[in-house]
Amino acid sequence: MDIIFYHPTFDTQWWIEALRKAIPQARVRAWKSGDNDSADYALVWHPPVEMLAGRDLKAVFALGAGVDSILSKLQAHPEMLKPSVPLFRLEDTGMGEQMQEYAVSQVLHWFRRFDDYRIQQNSSHWQPLPEYHREDFTIGILGAGVLGSKVAQSLQTWRFPLRCWSRTRKSWPGVQSFAGREELSAFLSQCRVLINLLPNTPETVGIINQQLIEKLPDGAYLLNLARGVHVVEDDLLAALDSGKVKGAMLDVFNREPLPPESLLWQHPRVTITPHVAAITRPAEAVEYISRTIAQLEKGERLCGQVDRARGY
């Protein structure tokens, strides 16, 4: 069994050694330009076209929760990956726990009005504010996949009213489910906090725009943990300036790194983190990949395979 590995920023040597230990029967090598030797599996992130083109692979593993970079490259270069080759993403591997920490901490930050108190502190102003009430602080999750379900579970502990929206209806205990475009307006109408965990597909690009924001309650909050392309940044800035959106926590952006001239940097109602809400945990990823390869070698049916037509 031959495995090729490519990631532009990861510690390649660590990964190769960890994979060799986890899959002793495998010959693991770092892929370099010009390497056309045979391979059974490819572990990749933003791979060059030549790495995968023409190979008879058993599977490709994307080293992250999203596969949009691979799928977008496939649109431009269909020859990069044969249609018969399964594509897998890292469904969790510790990312669910990180998303839970990030989402819960920020929801509580807004619920306890720490954002308002920070603004008061900046002007040396002492003024206790009325508290928010849980029953009026409905949290809506856009995107009800693996990470969305994890976030919903963690927020249930705090007894907030919860709802989710996705392409198909979900049966999550304690979470009101909405499905399809025809139910999006009803979903949005009660969301004091909107958490975006949608996949990046042609249908979801620009979905958080002026039209969507107008359907939220006045003074809603936005937490974007998915992809920057989901948000029309000018529309969000206008909503923040008008008070329609009271605050935004943004981990992802249309351009990354976020350009210094972006107005988001200086907005008093925006908090920015540099795409760190959930990062790949190498040890857990290696364990998942080695287990999945073992199952593939046995011919077992697996979860986590990407539907290329849907984009996730």
UniProtKB/Swiss-Prot annotation:
EC number: 1.1.1.79, 1.1.1.81
GO MF terms, alphabetically ordered: glyoxylate reductase (NADPH) activity; hydroxypyruvate reductase (NADH) activity; hydroxypyruvate reductase (NADPH) activity; NAD binding
Location in the cell: Cytoplasm
Gene3D superfamilies for this protein: NAD(P)-binding Rossmann-like Domain (3.40.50.720)
Family assignment from sequence similarity: Belongs to the D-isomer specific 2-hydroxyacid dehydrogenase family. GhrA subfamily.
Function: Catalyzes the NADPH-dependent reduction of glyoxylate and hydroxypyruvate into glycolate and glycerate, respectively.
Full protein name: Glyoxylate/hydroxypyruvate reductase A
Species for this entry: Escherichia coli O6:H1 (strain CFT073 / ATCC 700928 / UPEC)
